[in-house]
């Protein structure tokens, strides 16, 4: 019996010594370090997905989806994407162009004749070079009833009525424009004969199996989505997180809840990764069309402005082409960054008014991916 126990003990020792616990992947350990620091020092609250060479290596959730109830975020949590939505608007235009229903250099008055401007093209709208002013300021100037939710047709009507001067001649400068992308959504609706939400669902979300993605207007629809990540703002005076609807400085979240094209796509990190993968294929549009979307446009003087169709464009000497977009709306700060040549991807969705946390995570994860790529 003693001999048996001795032999068993030796066998156990040999087994445990020959099969040590697998060390954590250095990249995952590095990402964990970034995220732990962001949570501890910057109050990061949200979901993160990191892909390496086209495969997900990290997907985690941090914090509550609802600070009132204490419900926690998970992989299926749905976030308002804010301006990350613009890439979907651009894709809708690209699809209609491939169908022969419009051209990038068409004058926008061909589709929205109410606009009081000449020389603005769809390409100008796609690349933020049209010179059109912002609708938010125009609505406020007109004395819009804050208890009334505006929609895209309201924006068109206000511009037709007020005829505000352009900020600059089309193509002369680059200036980010939410109005341009709202107008693009109106063009999609008028050309396709479908609502903007229907078009995105039928042509993008369903074909890509993005089951948790849709146009969603929290206040206008009255519908409550399961697993919804409610956007909260930390009130310094109250020392707690509150919904923006409860804070007087953010009353416009109600007024502008009906505007489509510049925001209001809602999605998950997992669905956005499906979107990321599809952009490498010709499932939605041809690869030639995608290449044009990922190429910086230029101004009238031929200088590049660093924006394609719905994406900021960056060329890194170590990692190649990077396309990205951030999204900001009261209670949300988001980022999607695609390393086109390597297949790496960073998706950061947050449901708190905390741009420093998003920026910290995005910049650090980019640095870690680039560093790892350089030492392969």
Predicted features and spans:
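Short, glycine/proline-biased beta-turn/loop segments that scaffold the active-site neighborhood
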Residues: 104-118, 206-208
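Active-site SXXK
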Residues: 35, 48, 54, 78-106, ...
